Amino acid sequence: MEITLGIAMFTVIVLALAVIILFAKSKLVNSGDITIEINDDPSKAIHLPAGGKLLGALASQGIFVSSACGGGGSCGQCIVKVTEGGGDILPTELSHISKREAKEGYRLSCQVNVKNSMKVELPEEVFGVKKWECTVISNDNKATFIKELKLAIPEGEEVPFRAGGYIQIEAEPHTVAYKDFDIPEEYHEDWDKYNLWRYVSKVDEHIIRAYSMASYPEEKGIIMLNVRIATPPPNNPDAPPGQMSSYIWSLKAGDKVTISGPFGEFFAKETDAEMVFVGGGAGMAPMRSHIFDQLKRLKSKRKMSFWYGARSKREMFYVEDFDTLQAENDNFVWHVALSDPQPGDNWDGYTGFIHNVLYENYLKDHEAPEDCEYYMCGPPIMNASVIKMLKDLGVEDENILLDDFGG
């Protein structure tokens, strides 16, 4: 009898808990259809089932908001203005959104739960963003840890981007073994030294990452990226390798790749001011895009120089391209500084870190460095060093333009 009573009591408790959970869920999650009004324009309103995040909800309706981290909340790019609904701002958003912005309704769309109808404001350029399935033309090493991925846009289509812009690339769940990478023998030294062939990248979810374009608008029908493989650092060799860079390095000619875009704000100012470009590593991508666009498409006569930092001669690329531009344009010069030239390099050019080389060999004696516009993209330590040097020279923030990708 006691056993039967105990079982009955247990069953009642379980059923009561189930009812409470279902009731709470009904209050917390609206399972019906909701409406997201956009920019107070009835024609832009979307209707969809409740659930998920605002970033994904918009994407499901063909509205692609920039998100370099793929919705992880770390890049801070997917900011939108929520004027009604959306709940309270989350602590994870406050590292990217100021208190003033939060009061005005700004949110990270990847963190906003879609439970009820809401009203949002989006930049108009978002509605020009599209998605394409591209075909890999080539994926060749340009340096030890950098590949140039060249993609063909579907016939009859074009990506209407501006120089300095970027696209987002997608990947489904996958497993990539580094031992299967196609890497020319000349680049094997460091791969062997650090035994990088042992790594495997296993991804169990759909991922999205942003990459600056190396191509410029007149290179029709293609998108070109410079992608640095994100290997685990030597001081933490058991850390997982970069998910998207590993995926991209595994791609071969003929493979299909989904991209969306164009996005961007790292655009050249329309002035007559002197332009100084500073790059390093895969930060070459937007530098190439900008410089080619200025000299080849716009036929710009603005004074401009390009200062690129590399470790050794093996890490230099697009050398012939920039040599040709320099020969054809009196208003353009470019310089490379090697931080660790090898004995076999027979290097007689600049050596050291690029910010020091730029200062000692040009800006130190420049009559008005504060009047120049500085465009830069490279490893974080390079960016920080260049910015400090420019600040010390009195350059205002408005003349320092930084692309945080590509490095």
Swiss-Prot record:
S-S bridge residues: none
Organism ancestry: Bacteria, Pseudomonadati, Pseudomonadota, Gammaproteobacteria, Pasteurellales
Protein name listed in UniProt: Na(+)-translocating NADH-quinone reductase subunit F
Enzyme Commission code(s) on record: 7.2.1.1
Cofactor note as given: Binds 1 [2Fe-2S] cluster.
GN (gene name): nqrF
Catalytic activity from the UniProt record: a ubiquinone + n Na(+)(in) + NADH + H(+) = a ubiquinol + n Na(+)(out) + NAD(+)
Description of how the protein assembles with itself and partners: Composed of six subunits; NqrA, NqrB, NqrC, NqrD, NqrE and NqrF.
Domain FAD-binding FR-type positions: 129-269
Major localisation: membrane
Topological type in the membrane: Single-pass membrane protein
Keywords associated with the record: 2Fe-2S, Cell inner membrane, Cell membrane, FAD, Flavoprotein, Ion transport, Iron, Iron-sulfur, Membrane, Metal-binding, NAD, Sodium, Sodium transport, Translocase, Transmembrane, Transmembrane helix, Transport, Ubiquinone
Gene Ontology molecular function: any one: 2 iron, 2 sulfur cluster binding
